[in-house]
Amino acid sequence: MKTNILRITFLILIIINSVIIFGFSAQNGEESGNLSKLVISKIADILNIEENRENFLEVGESIVRKLAHFSIYTSLGIWLISFILTFKLKLKYQITIASVLGIVYAITDEFHQKFSFGRHASINDVIIDSLGIFFGITLVLLVITIYKKLKIKNAKKYKIGNWKK
């Protein structure tokens, strides 16, 4: 029962994440650009950048866009691997399935973006999205590994279980 609740929860998070990505891709070029400009403009205000502000905004907008791609796909990678880890498969298959699903979604997202006015598809974005997927998967596996090591260490420390000194 607990496994089913986890699966449903992670599946809902995958769907929400995918809908958000779809929404961003459906924005026309002007809307998308304005959102990036708003974010970098707020950053410039917080950092109190006056000198070379226009240059900062221009360069920063590109960085914000790439970080947005990476971040949203990192979260998708987290939800994908978390969902797939609820199934009893070898770890290498779980990682492969999560990676392939994430990359396929990134490719279809770029294809969808081609049909939004003022937007185009970019192989660079697919690469950044894929790196985000891999990073999300790696984060989850790292957290699980650390958790297991701490659990074993504490079990030994407090003599829980059948540990020998």
Role assignments for model-derived ranges:
Residues I16-I21, Q94-K114:
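Small-polar-interrupted transmembrane alpha-helices in polytopic inner-membrane proteins
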Residues E31, F83-L91, F115-R119, L142, ...:
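Membrane-interface elements of multi-pass transporters and channels
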Residues F56, G60, V100, N124-I127:
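Alpha-helical membrane-protein architecture signal
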Residues N4-I8, F87-I97, R119-I123:
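Membrane-helix interface segments
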Residues A106-S130:
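Interfacial helix-loop-helix junctions of multi-pass membrane proteins
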Residues K2-T74:
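"…centered on the first transmembrane helix and the immediately adjacent amphipathic helix/loop
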Residues K151-K165:
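Membrane-interfacial, low-structure loops and terminal tails that flank and connect transmembrane helices
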Residues Y73-F87, G132-Y147:
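Membrane-interfacial alpha-helical segments at the cytosolic side of multi-pass membrane proteins
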